Amino acid sequence: MIESNESYSYGGDTIEPLGTLSGFDLVRRALEEARAAACAQGKDAGRGHVVPPVPFRVTDRRRNWSGPGPDVRDPQPLGKVAHDLAKKRGWSAQVAEGRVFGQWASMVGGQIADHAFPVGLNNGVLSVTAESTAWATQLRIMQAQLLAKIAAAVGNGVVTSLKITGPTAPSWRKGPWHIAGRGPRDTYG
């Protein structure tokens, strides 16, 4: 490169010194020098990737029907498409967890579903709330059978254990602030 502020000629072109160029002209000049260096080395100094046009053939206009046999272009059932999408995107675990809540009655039976409902599912532990302590006790006894029914419906590993609770007991706490009192008293005697 020339360090002076004089113009010089290179290959028939008059080249301005770098000190007089600024902004876009300086960038354009650097690009031209890089292209010239690439051409001097025998490389293709392209102006970006250009896809050659594909010649148009008359056969491209003909419609390709799927024919009498099954084809990937045939209409698919919505359930199959949704299942394939969930599997492809890695949503299978979340969909299985949602099925526990959505199909609770069909998984455990109508009688149990009338008296207990799922509340949450965290790390494979399904929290179930029963409408009475008697139903909570009965569900704790049936816990192994419930886990087997759930695993048969949504697959193994989705629900690993059950946390069964009864209805909440009445609370005497009032307001957002609480100071520890003297403990429970005999209020019913």
From Swiss-Prot:
| Protein known as | UPF0232 protein ML0004
Task: Spell out the coiled coil positions from the record.
Answer: none
Q: Name one Pfam family in it.
A: DciA
Its taxonomic placement starts with: Bacteria, Bacillati, Actinomycetota, Actinomycetes, Mycobacteriales
Record-linked NCBIfam families: PRK03195.1 (NF002871)
Superkingdom field: Bacteria
Q: Which family does this protein fall into? A: Belongs to the UPF0232 family.
What segment(s) does the record annotate as region Disordered? 59-78
Native organism: Mycobacterium leprae (strain TN)
